[in-house]
Amino acid sequence: MQKIGIYPGTFDPVTNGHIDIIHRSSELFEKLIVAVAHSSAKNPMFSLDERLKMMQLATKSFKNVECVAFEGLLADLAKEYHCKVLVRGLRVVSDFEYELQMGYANKSLNHELETLYFMPTLQNAFISSSIVRSIIAHKGDASHLVPKEIYPFISKV
């Protein structure tokens, strides 16, 4: 059986921090599924289709990465792909508190599921999608925070 990991998120938009985690975690798995979440609760700036397209553009050079859109429980998606490991990023203490709760919740829904946490590299530690959204909403230049493939896409906002 293939070693498969899932890296879920809203990716609204995808940032260099996300790509850093994808790069490092893709080396641990035969296949890494990047699962772009519907997430109506977060009121995303970009539609699900736009976020999926941006992620596909940003990850096209990774041979073992597949991008999918999903709605519903992450634990169910993991079962569908026969995945036993979720990949998550941790930047700050508040991320840890939230991710710990989510990890326990996912484990309660799928007992085989483990969560692997990645700390960002120092150069990406401050980057978040919300910072990028704020910069682009104010017509600022966020090109140094996102993959070059998607900057033309987000600069149209």
From Swiss-Prot:
- How does the record describe its quaternary structure? Homohexamer.
For this entry, the protein name equals Phosphopantetheine adenylyltransferase
Q: Which HAMAP family match?
A: PPAT_bact
Localization annotation: Cytoplasm
Against Pfam families, the record matches this protein to: CTP_transf_like (PF01467)
Q: Tell me which residues bind substrate.
A: 10, 42, 74, 88
- For this protein, what reaction is catalysed? (R)-4'-phosphopantetheine + ATP + H(+) = 3'-dephospho-CoA + diphosphate
Class of this enzyme: transferase
Which residue windows are transmembrane per the record?
none
Q: What is its main location?
A: cytoplasm
Instruction: Give the family, as the similarity comment puts it.
Output: Belongs to the bacterial CoaD family.
| A GO cellular-component term linked to this record | cytoplasm
Tell me the superkingdom of the source. Bacteria
